[in-house]
Amino acid sequence: AASDVYKRQVILAAVIYFYVNHQYSSYEVKNTIALKKSSGMKCSAYQNGVLRYSRDGAAAVDRDGNEMWNGSYDMENPALDICEKYAVVADIQGKSLYVYNGSDSGTKLTTDYPILQACVSKQGVVAVLLEDQSSNVIQVYNPYDDNKKLLVEIPTNVEEGYPVSIDLSPDGTGVICASICVTSGAVKSQVAFYDFTDVGKNTNCLVGAQEYKDRIVAEVKYLDEDHATLFSEKGFSLWKNMKKPKQVFKKDWNREILSAFYDDRYIGVIAAGSKKGSGRMYLFNTSGGKVFERQVATDFTNVTMADEEIYMVTTEGCKIYRKNGVETVSYTHLTL
């Protein structure tokens, strides 16, 4: 009996090993979706389908090509943000944005100042970074509340620097803002953490701040309601407990950072290697533990992560890596 149990364990281990290390050598086209071309059209993964947006509108289709929703608008420079079924398209340097709830034609919001960035939460709450003449402003809206659309307004001043990146928590209750400021000829970054619940009501919503004199924080991102990451030209840092933010991990590289990617469980970085055209891919969990490190080519144009897989679009095709670092797909001259 013991030997039978051992055999089953060996077989199970072999099956698991085969699954996590299997490399595919071919593919089958399950479906082809024709997208109507328009000026400056861009696409993004959305709800197991595709969301396309351009200067004149946005639309989402499922994996079978069935339209889920569409909406029209007129924008010069549309930018997209997605959180679960909600999406926001904002006209950068314009004053309009549209919020989509996954089934309607969009709800319009108009701002008083030019838009620099917009983010959406899983409830449809939107945070917008606006450019005023004397200072920048962060405004948080509920587009579906007819009585009080503007929920919070956070002014910034010259002393705090020029905001370059904001992000809204998935539950819509917090914002992180990274700013750049120049003091006595030296450039530094300041990161502010805001909370709109009762936790932050006695401090004008500010629950944490961090100054960096040795790096420029270019992007901030919530991984979930309680974890966030800050990306700089040197590396990244991990923060937890967004009601009382605390840095729990920091990783720097002495080589150029070529790309960074993430999902709600992992953070990845590709740094330049010692040879031209070669790089190192690193994957970390939200505690800062290194999951894997491996060599990759640097001919990629985009890197994203979803469903615990890393998708790398290259100049000639695509590559897919599992979270253990195994390359499962490698296609060149990919044509569908």
What name fits each language-model region?
Residues 28-34, 66-71, 104-110, 149-156, ...:
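A short beta-strand motif characteristic of beta-propeller blades
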Residues 2-9, 332-336:
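Conserved small/polar residues in nucleotide/adenosyl-binding loops
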Residues 138-141, 147-151, 155-215, 221-223, ...:
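Solenoidal tandem-repeat scaffolds enriched in leucines and small polar residues
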Residues 30-56, 72-80:
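Beta-strand-rich domains and repeat architectures in extracellular enzymes and scaffolds
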Residues 38-42, 76-82, 113-121, 160-167, ...:
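Repeated scaffold domains used in trafficking and secretory/extracellular systems
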Residues 96-98, 135-139, 184-193, 235-239, ...:
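Structural motif
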Residues 42, 46-53, 85-91, 124-131, ...:
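Short beta-strand elements that form the blades of beta-propeller/WD-repeat-like
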Residues 82, 86-174:
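Non-cytosolic head/periplasmic domains of membrane-anchored proteins
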